C-alpha cells in the first residue's frame, strides 16, 4: 500500500517538474512591468510598453534609437543619453542598433584619484 502512495507521489512530482521546465523554456520574459521592473533582467529582458521583452527583440523592432533608452549606434549615443559609455552590437547582424552598457576600466576609475591636489 505504501508503494502505491509513493508511486502516485512520484508521478505527480515528475509531472510538476516537466511542466515547470516547459513553461520556463517557452516564455523567458513573460511578466509585466507596470509597477515593478522586470525580474528577468538577468536573462536579458527589459521593459517596453509595460511588458518585458528580450533585448534583441526590442532592438530588432526599433525604428530609431529613441524607441528605447538603452538603444545606441555608437558609444557617443550612450554617453549623450546617460545610460552608459559602451555600445555593444548584437550578434544578429539584422539588428542595426546596439545596447548601452556601463563599462568602467581601471584607468577610468583612477583618473580622478591620480590628479595632483
UniProtKB/Swiss-Prot annotation:
Keyword Signal tagged: yes
PTM annotation, UniProt: Contains 3 disulfide bonds.
Biological process according to GO: defense response
PROSITE patterns according to UniProt: CYCLOTIDE, CYCLOTIDE_BRACELET
UniProt-listed SUPFAM superfamilies: Cyclotides (SSF57038)
Cross-link Cyclopeptide (Gly-Asn), where in sequence: 26-55
InterPro entries: Albumin_I_a, Cyclotide, Cyclotide_bracelet_CS, Cyclotide_sf
Keyword Ribonucleoprotein: no
A Pfam family annotated for this UniProt entry: Albumin_I_a
UniProt function note: Probably participates in a plant defense mechanism.
Domain notes for this protein: The presence of a 'disulfide through disulfide knot' structurally defines this protein as a knottin.
Protein family according to the UniProt entry: Belongs to the cyclotide family. Bracelet subfamily.
Identification of the protein by name: Cliotide T9
Record organism: Clitoria ternatea (Butterfly pea)
Amino acid at each position: 500500500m505504501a508503494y502505491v502512495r509513493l508511486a502516485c507521489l512520484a508521478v505527480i512530482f515528475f509531472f510538476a517538474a516537466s511542466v515547470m521546465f516547459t513553461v520556463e523554456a517557452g516564455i523567458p520574459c513573460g511578466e509585466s512591468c507596470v509597477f515593478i521592473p522586470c525580474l528577468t533582467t538577468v536573462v536579458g529582458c527589459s521593459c517596453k510598453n509595460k511588458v518585458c521583452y528580450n533585448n534583441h527583440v526590442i532592438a530588432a523592432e526599433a525604428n530609431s534609437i529613441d524607441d528605447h533608452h538603452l538603444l545606441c549606434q555608437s558609444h557617443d549615443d550612450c554617453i549623450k543619453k546617460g545610460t552608459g559609455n559602451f555600445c555593444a552590437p548584437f550578434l544578429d547582424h539584422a539588428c542595426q542598433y546596439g545596447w548601452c552598457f556601463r563599462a568602467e576600466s581601471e584607468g577610468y576609475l583612477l583618473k580622478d584619484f591620480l590628479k595632483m591636489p
